[in-house]
Each structure stands twice: as structure tokens, then as C-alpha cells.
Amino acid sequence: MSIQVSGLCKHFGQFTALNNVSIEFPSGGLVALLGPSGCGKTSLLRVIAGLERPDSGTVAIQNRDVSGLDIRERQVGFVFQHYALFRHMTIFENVAFGLRAKPKARRPNEATIKQKVNRLLQLVQLDWLADRYPAQLSGGQRQRVALARALAIEPQVLLLDEPFGALDAKVRKELRRWLRKLHDELHITSLFVTHDQEEALEVADHIVVMNKGQIEQIGTPEEIYRTPRTEFVYQFVGSSNRLYLEDSNGLSFTPSDVVSTHGKQAKRIYCRPHDFAVNTQHRPDAIPVAVARKLALGNMVRLEAYSLDNQQLVEVELSNHDPVLDEIQAKRHLWLTPKTVSQFA
């Protein structure tokens, strides 16, 4: 089922959570709403779900206007960050809850409920825990139960609000892989909110980057990372170093957003930490830096250095097999040449 959002505005007092947001989410896609805290991503999800009413604008599911309907009438499944499982119910009873709570005319019989719940528990690989209680499960297992419960009512769309935010890094990575596999089996239209760029890049078919209540860019993970349309997207998705173009031949760092040099307006340009060529010998066309720290991070080494021109921090990432690392120690001077840059006016 596709989702159409048109002209959504939402205010909380003087704060603008959504500012005239319009977007269509394709049927069967897994879409990440990505952005910093307060950008509007959770407000957008809650308005689509019917948990919040917009000040203006409409929400349609499969071209049917649902703006005036509450969450039960919209046929959406919603998964919260903190599970929201009933502690006094078994895992089986938690998953069955939505089915048993349906109006009598639409409520399945107990045999059908049992069959559906058992099938869902098998799908999320927790059928062997059906008689346990939430307190007896790990955080990752509880989140899978919450997802099974959301799927039990056969929703038209699935909405997830930072579903892995309360879990540790290793469990998050396992569940991201599991969610992607599950979606490929079910093909249900799904939106998930996250502030974790790695999570969005790894899991989603498409990413919607939001900032200050508006959409900055929509694209595939590769498009968002490789061809950011705005300065905000470049800075938010992936690590970056800010530079400015002094003239046609030279690059230099600056702490300012816009710099005028010799009467010329400098462009703001950026370089990823892994896109520097590192030289241990002086080069007149390179950026001179002094190494402050050398950090071993698994298969990568990160250098924290400071520009000799203005003391701006520069991050450089190298493979831990790079031979130049043997020559690099703290306080060592290096010369950096950007191999690839992105420019913004």
C-alpha cells in the first residue's frame, strides 16, 4: 500500500515540527526517515499513524484519505522503541492481543488466532518462547515480539519508531539484518525512524533526510551518500571535513561558513576523511597538518590532525595496511591532498 502525504504542518506551541511536508512512499518499500533530534521525523510518523493530528494537510493510504480516522481505523502496525509489551501476558498472549481486541464482528475465532500467532512467532524465530513472559526475554527478543504483535493485525503499512534505539550495538546490527530479510519476505510498506545513518544506509530501500521540519533529500542510500544535494545532507550523512577554495590552484581550511579571500567569495567545499592523499614530504599544493592522535579502529586507522594554517581539526581515515602509517607518529607533519570534494555555493 502506498502512502501519500500532502502539505502537512504541525506545531507544538511556537515550535514547528512539520513545515508543509509533501511526499509519496511507494508500495512495498522499506523507507528510513533520517535526521537529528527535533527534525520532524517522529512527528511525521505519528501523523501518518493517526497518533497526532496535523494542523493542516492530508494523509492518504492507497489514495484513500485517512486524515480523519484514528489509528485503529487506518490499519497500521506501530512498533515503539521501548517494546510496550504487557508484562503480565505471555509472549503468545502479547502477539494475540490485537486480534482479540478487534470488534466482535471482525474478530477471528480462537483456532484462527492460535494458528496466526504460531505462524508469526515462527516467522520471527521465537515460537519456542511462546509461554515465556517479557521479563524472561532479551531486549532483541522483546523487540521481535513487538514486531510480531504489530504484524498480527495484518496492517496495510508498518511504522517503526527507532525500533533498535534501546539495544546495544551488536544486537542492533543483528536485528537490522533480520528486519531487512523479513521485509524481503513480506513486502509490506514500511517506514522506520532513525537518527543512525549507518542503520538507514544498511537497511532502507530509500532514505528521506529531514531537517527543521522539512525534507532535505529523498534517494537511495547510494544517492544520499555519494550525491548529496544540500550541505546539510553531506554533513549529516557520513563524516566530513569542511574546506574552502582559495583560488583555482589551492585549498585551505577555515572555521567560517563563507570566506572572502583577496576580494573573492570562497565556495564551501567538503572532503570525506577517506578521500585524502597523505604525503609525508612537503608539497606546495597540499594542506599542511600536524598529527595529534592516531587511532586504531579495527580495519581502519583514523588520524586526528590540525591545520598548520588555522588549527582547524582535520580527520583522515586510512586502511590499516597503508604503508604510510609506518611513518606517522604524533606531532608529525603531513601534507594532505583532497582526491574528491563536494562544493556548495
From Swiss-Prot:
It is an enzyme of class 7 (translocase). GO terms for cellular component: ATP-binding cassette (ABC) transporter complex. Its EC number is 7.3.2.3. Signal peptide: none annotated. Its main location: membrane. It comes from the Bacteria. GO terms for molecular function: ABC-type sulfate transporter activity; ABC-type thiosulfate transporter activity; ATP binding; ATP hydrolysis activity. It catalyses: sulfate(out) + ATP + H2O = sulfate(in) + ADP + phosphate + H(+); thiosulfate(out) + ATP + H2O = thiosulfate(in) + ADP + phosphate + H(+). Residues 3-237 form the ABC transporter domain. It is a peripheral membrane protein. It is found in: Cell inner membrane. ATP binds at residues 35-42. InterPro entries: AAA+_ATPase, ABC_SmlMolc_Importer, ABC_transporter-like_ATP-bd, ABC_transporter-like_CS, P-loop_NTPase, Sulph_transpt1, TOBE-like. Pfam families: ABC_tran, TOBE_3. Gene3D superfamilies: P-loop containing nucleotide triphosphate hydrolases (3.40.50.300). Keywords: ATP-binding, Cell inner membrane, Cell membrane, Membrane, Nucleotide-binding, Sulfate transport, Translocase, Transport. PANTHER family: SPERMIDINE/PUTRESCINE IMPORT ATP-BINDING PROTEIN POTA (PTHR42781), SPERMIDINE_PUTRESCINE IMPORT ATP-BINDING PROTEIN POTA (PTHR42781:SF4). Part of the ABC transporter complex CysAWTP involved in sulfate/thiosulfate import. Responsible for energy coupling to the transport system. The complex is composed of two ATP-binding proteins (CysA), two transmembrane proteins (CysT and CysW) and a solute-binding protein (CysP). Belongs to the ABC transporter superfamily. Sulfate/tungstate importer (TC 3.A.1.6) family. This is Sulfate/thiosulfate import ATP-binding protein CysA. The gene is cysA.
